[in-house]
Amino acid sequence: MPKMKTKTAAKKRFKITGTGKVKAAAAGKRHGMIKRSNKFIRDARGTMVLADADAKIVKQFLPNGL
């Protein structure tokens, strides 16, 4: 059976932590930020941990745990 390839798009967008959780950038900050609250803008600046259901899907795209 051939080796599983890593999805390059997922490799650029997600990181797997040492404990196995998946980190990603917060969504909703490309445009239209003028109407958002300062708290939203502040919270969207960093990364967030994905929910377990989403993390399970992302881990299939990253078989080598990049």
Swiss-Prot record:
GO molecular function, a single term: structural constituent of ribosome
Biological processes, Gene Ontology terms: translation
Keyword vocabulary terms for this entry: Ribonucleoprotein, Ribosomal protein
Coiled coil region boundaries: none
The keyword Ribosomal protein belongs to this UniProt entry's keyword annotation: yes
Pfam families the UniProt entry points to: Ribosomal_L35p
Any one GO CC term of the record: cytosolic large ribosomal subunit
Stated family: Belongs to the bacterial ribosomal protein bL35 family.
HAMAP family: Ribosomal_bL35
Protein name as catalogued: Large ribosomal subunit protein bL35
Organism: Brucella canis (strain ATCC 23365 / NCTC 10854 / RM-666)
